[in-house]
Swiss-Prot record:
Principal subcellular localisation of the protein: mitochondrion
UniProt entry keywords in alphabetical sequence: Electron transport, Heme, Iron, Membrane, Metal-binding, Mitochondrion, Mitochondrion inner membrane, Respiratory chain, Transmembrane, Transmembrane helix, Transport, Ubiquinone
The protein's name: Cytochrome b
Subcellular localization: Mitochondrion inner membrane
């Protein structure tokens, strides 16, 4: 008799995705981040659900309800900080996952890659609307500044901003709808994740060499289930350490002050995971130009498969491309640092140079060096 997991309609899907899935035998720990992102998503949905049971999306009570969760609800402080720091872990895993894709040429699976970019945008939107909910100073002013960017769109900009606000400023209507968005988006993300996996399993996983590994596959379980469990334990350990020892390390102290439309904080800045994009936005002295650069800094990922000029898929055997890749990582870290600094000399010029380098590396230098590497292969 055939095993039920191979015949039952539902079990069969799970079996083909997580148990008997043929997987390359040589994928490294950089391939762990996919499952870690799944774990982060489940964790965020669960902690978020319990927070939503006690949170009130109203301007007069939102801040107090978060304080109530932290003070009066059993382990409320723990759930709240798990959720806040869980978002940081989510983005660390996301950026590592994207970096892996760039390094090893996983973007050549175009459908999987494009769904991935869409997922990145959706997660960023979710994090943004979520940050507004505690209704602290940085929540309010962050929402005001970022939604205001849409007013740079010619002709319809102002109307669009007021439509999103539900009034003439960020107010009760804005908070209520942002809570609604923050609740629905993770479920949209879950659906997109299923599509992401569907497309991935059409082609099978890439591997560090970038060479097809169809002749050397092993079952996902037990080899990679055990490897993923190790990754998950390390992720949980990091998250718990952050949550229990320094829960506010990555947060902004300004968000412990209730939102006040009459008092602007000295330095308005987003959470650390948006700082690189914020630095690119600020580096252009024109509003529309800044907004376009901000959008392009993320959407440029869509064009990466078209910019592939190398004859090799992976960067594993391409030392010059590796050098440029790590330069790009250093540049992104520089932009992240600049995004958190005030707009004054020398940060302005450093931010502008780092922004130029970011686009130059992706659009010009990396495709060019790949062509040179192709020539070197012929020697």
């Amino acid at each position: 008799m055939t095993n039920i997991r191979k015949t039952h309609p539902l079990m069969k899907i799970i079996n083909n995705a997580f148990i008997d899935l043929p997987t390359p035998s040589n994928i490294s720990s950089w391939w762990n981040f996919g499952s870690l992102l799944g774990l982060c998503l489940i964790m965020q949905i669960l902690t978020g659900l319990f927070l939503a049971m006690h949170y009130t999306p109203d301007t007069s009570t939102a801040f107090s309800s978060v304080a109530h969760i932290c003070r009066d609800v059993n382990y409320g402080w723990f759930i709240r900080y798990l959720h806040a720091n869980g978002a940081s872990m989510f983005f660390i895993c996301l950026y590592a996952h994207i970096g892996r894709g760039l390094y090893y040429g996983s973007y050549m699976f175009q459908e999987t890659w494009n769904i991935g970019v869409l997922l990145l945008l959706t997660v960023m939107a979710t994090a943004f609307v979520g940050y507004v909910l505690p209704w602290g100073q940085m929540s309010f002013w962050g929402a005001t500044v970022i939604t205001n960017l849409l007013s740079a769109i010619p002709y319809i900009g102002t109307t669009l901003v007021e439509w999103i606000w539900g009034g003439f400023s960020v107010d009760k209507a804005t908070l209520t709808r942002f809570f609604a968005f923050h609740f629905i988006l993770p479920f949209i993300i879950t659906a997109l994740v299923a599509v992401h996996l569907l497309f991935l399993h059409e082609t099978g996983s890439n591997n560090p060499t970038g060479i097809p590994s169809n002749m050397d596959m092993i079952p996902f379980h037990p080899y990679y289930t055990i490897k993923d469990i190790l990754g998950a334990l390390l992720l949980i350990l990091t998250l718990l350490t952050l949550t229990l020892f320094t829960p506010d390390l990555l947060g902004d102290p300004d968000n412990y002050t209730p939102a006040n439309p009459l008092s602007t904080p000295a330095h308005i800045k987003p959470e650390w995971y948006f700082l690189f994009a914020y630095a690119i936005l600020r580096s252009i002295p024109n509003k529309l130009g800044g907004v376009l650069a901000l959008l392009l800094s993320i959407l440029i990922l869509i064009f990466i498969p078209m910019l592939q000029t190398s004859k090799q898929r992976s960067m594993m055997f391409r030392p010059f491309s590796q050098l440029l890749f790590w330069t790009l990582i250093a540049d992104l870290l520089t932009l992240t640092w600049i995004g958190g600094q005030p707009v004054e000399h020398p940060y302005i010029i450093v931010g502008q140079l780092a922004s130029i380098l970011y686009f130059l590396l992706i659009l010009v230098l990396m495709p060019t060096i790949s062509l040179i590497e192709n020539k070197l292969l012929k020697w």
